[in-house]
C-alpha cells in the first residue's frame, strides 16, 4: 500500500486502459473545480521536461527494454512529484493527475516486470484521496482507439513484446493484460470503478458526486477573490 496523503491538499487521479474516456472526464472535472473556486493543478503521465528528449529518442530507435522503460517512466513521475505535485499538495491545492503510479503497476507488469519491484519503485508516492478507474470492455476500448487514430504507435501497441505481427491484435492483447492488472488493483488500492460505457454526462455526474463528498468540509487553497482563475498545469 502507498502512504496516506497527510498534506493539506487533495490528490485526485484517473486511471484506465487506452480508450477508457478518463481524459475527457478529468478535463471536465478540472473545469468544474475551478468554477467552484478551487485552486487546481493538472499533471499528466509522461510530461516531465527532464526526460522528454531521452524518452522520444529511445522510442524512435526502439531501445527500451521493459526494465529501462519502467525506470525512465518512474524518473518522469518522480521529477513531477518532487517539483510540482508534492509542493502544491503541501500548499493546499487540488492536484488532478491523468494517470498515476497505477499506470506503471499495470503497464510494466503487463510487460513482464516483477509486480512487487514496480510497487517498491513508487513507494515514495502517496495514496490518492480519490482514485477513479474508468472501466470499459476491451473490445470497446480497442474500437475507440483504432477508429480515432490512423495508426498505433510501436510501444503503445506492445509491439516490443512480440505478441503479434499485427499492431491492432498486439494492442488488444497488451491492453487486455493491463486491464487484468487494473482489476486486481481495485481492492488493493481502493480504486473507485466508474462504468466507462455510460454517457459522458452520466459519468461526469458520478464523478462530481464522489468529489463533492470528498471535499465536503475541506478548506484548501482558494483562488484569491477578485483575481483571474489562472490555469495551473504541467508543462507538456
Can you say where each PLM-predicted feature lies in the sequence?
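P-loop (Walker A) phosphate-binding loop of NTP-binding proteins
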Residues: 17
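Hydrophobic anchor at the beta1->P-loop junction of P-loop NTPases
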Residues: 14
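Conserved lysine of the Walker
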Residues: 22
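A glycine- and Lys/Arg-enriched "phosphate-lid" helix/loop adjacent to the NTP-binding pocket
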Residues: 104-177
Amino acid at each position: 500500500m502507498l502512504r496516506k496523503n497527510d498534506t493539506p491538499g487533495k490528490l485526485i487521479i484517473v486511471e484506465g486502459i487506452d480508450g477508457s474516456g478518463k481524459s475527457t472526464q478529468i478535463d471536465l472535472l478540472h473545469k468544474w473545480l475551478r468554477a467552484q473556486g478551487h485552486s487546481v493543478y493538472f499533471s499528466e503521465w509522461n510530461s516531465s521536461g527532464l526526460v522528454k528528449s531521452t524518452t522520444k529518442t529511445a522510442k524512435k530507435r526502439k531501445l527500451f527494454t521493459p526494465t529501462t522503460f519502467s525506470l525512465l517512466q518512474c524518473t518522469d513521475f518522480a521529477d513531477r512529484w518532487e517539483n510540482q505535485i508534492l509542493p502544491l499538495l503541501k500548499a493546499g491545492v487540488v492536484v488532478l493527475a491523468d494517470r498515476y503510479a497505477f499506470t506503471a503497476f499495470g503497464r510494466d507488469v503487463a510487460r513482464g516486470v516483477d509486480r512487487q519491484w514496480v510497487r517498491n519503485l513508487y513507494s515514495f508516492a502517496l495514496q490518492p484521496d480519490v482514485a477513479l478507474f474508468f472501466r470499459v470492455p476491451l473490445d470497446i476500448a480497442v474500437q475507440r482507439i483504432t477508429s480515432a487514430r490512423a495508426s498505433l504507435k510501436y510501444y503503445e501497441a506492445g509491439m516490443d513484446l512480440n505478441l503479434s505481427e499485427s499492431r491492432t491484435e498486439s494492442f488488444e492483447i497488451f491492453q487486455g493484460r493491463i486491464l487484468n492488472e487494473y482489476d486486481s488493483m481495485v481492492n488493493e488500492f481502493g480504486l473507485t470503478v466508474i462504468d466507462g460505457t455510460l454517457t459522458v454526462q452520466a459519468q461526469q455526474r458520478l464523478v462530481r458526486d464522489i468529489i463533492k463528498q470528498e471535499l465536503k468540509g475541506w478548506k484548501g487553497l482558494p483562488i484569491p477573490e477578485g483575481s483571474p482563475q489562472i490555469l495551473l498545469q504541467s508543462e507538456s
